[in-house]
A protein has these predicted regions:
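Small-residue-enriched flexible segments
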Residues: 2-6, 154, 161-162
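Short glycine-rich or small-residue beta-strand-to-loop segments that form or flank ligand, phosphate
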Residues: 33-44, 66-72, 143-147
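An acidic, phosphate/nucleotide-engaging active-site surface
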Residues: 77-157
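Glycine-rich phosphate/diphosphate-binding loops that line cofactor/substrate pockets in enzymes
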Residues: 20-35, 60, 139
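N-terminal amphipathic/basic leader segments beginning at the initiator methionine
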Residues: 1-16
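A short, gly/pro- and small-residue-rich
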Residues: 54-58, 156-162
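A generic structural motif
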Residues: 62-73, 94-101
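Histidine-anchored nucleotide/phosphate-binding helix
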Residues: 43-65
Length: 162
């Protein structure tokens, strides 16, 4: 895969962004099933909604495209939140809801020795890593993570003791 970087001190135009995304997607000419994983509404001002709209517009004419917002343990997005973040062009039927209590499956464990090492001894327990089962089922030709979707532990309330 060719990496594509955009930089401009004055800002990157929507047309330049779409051009770069078309260049990226052009590297995968035979896509039939695509999963896009943007952040949820708690990151509505991240530009991930706009990027997801562009991806859907480019991919949906020739592939089945699903959008599964990375909810973590947050509440599912309602229709108004989806429209606010992703616009009207992506149909409700394209959205999948991540149910963290039922859909997460274990994929491995971060060993206690490693957590002790990287935390300088401040934390010393193993951590089980889980992902949504859809990531591993083999249905999708391409899975795209959009925006700041990063793994993190559930250790407290956001903007508080987390």
């Amino acid at each position: 895969m060719q990496e594509i970087y955009l930089t401009d001190r004055e800002g990157i135009s929507p047309s330049r962004t779409e051009q770069a995304i078309r260049q990226l997607i052009g590297q995968y000419p035979d896509l039939r099933n695509v999963l896009i994983i943007p952040p949820d509404y708690t990151r509505c001002y991240s530009y991930a909604g706009e990027l997801t709209q562009i991806l859907y517009r480019i991919l949906s004419p020739h592939a089945a495209v699903h959008v599964m917002p990375a909810l973590g343990t947050h509440m599912p997005m309602d229709a108004a939140e989806r429209r606010s973040m992703f616009g009207d062009a992506i149909p409700d039927s394209a959205f999948l809801v991540h149910n963290w209590q039922a859909d997460a499956i274990p994929i491995g464990t971060v060993p206690k020795a490693f957590t002790e090492e990287i935390s300088g001894g401040l934390y010393g327990e193993s951590i089980e890593a889980e992902v949504n089962w859809r990531l591993l089922e083999g249905r999708y030709d391409l899975i795209l993570s959009v925006g700041q979707v990063v793994p993190h532990e559930v250790v407290g309330m956001a903007n508080y003791s987390k």
